[in-house]
Amino acid sequence: MPPAELPPEERYKKAKEICFDLLAVRARTQEELRQALRRKGFDEETSETLLGKLDRAGLVNDAEFAELWVKSRHTTQGLSRTALMAELRRKGVDDEVAAQAAGEVDRESEEQMARELVRKRLGSLGNVDEQTALRRLLGFLARKGYPQGLAYTVIKEELREYGAESTLLDDAVID
């Protein structure tokens, strides 16, 4: 039966079950829950009432979600601050909250993660020429959201350390 046809108490109870089921899997933002309820056909009044209660009860907190999301995705996926902020925005986190959470990843840890990613990827590139390796590594770091200047610097140093005879980036001008 569509939620609109349920009595208000039943509609609220069903919406609450849906939210609790989603929250049992992982933390969610208010916007993620709002969209899930909208997809299931719940009216805005029921959704907003429930989300307000969940927020007041501390079960939904976008700032805490953003902080945990940044730590997890930076550590497990190696995402840069830029990519993390974009993900948080897509999940409905306020820009200011997203920026504050992504700011927890400092430049040094971002550079270290880029180095780890490049080292790991270098081992799996196989026997490719330096230009191909460079192109693939730059694309790889770009997809993770790393700034071009940082990517060039890290790849240049890691290729030297890895044993590349010459580095195509020696003469490159980095912005």
Curated annotation (Swiss-Prot):
It is found in: Cytoplasm. Its main location: cytoplasm. It comes from the Bacteria. InterPro entries: RecX_HTH_1st, RecX_HTH_2nd, RecX_HTH_3rd, Regulatory_RecX, WH-like_DNA-bd_sf. The keyword Cytoplasm applies. The keyword Cytoplasm applies. Keywords: Cytoplasm. GO terms for cellular component: cytoplasm. GO terms for biological process: regulation of DNA repair. This is Regulatory protein RecX. The gene is recX.
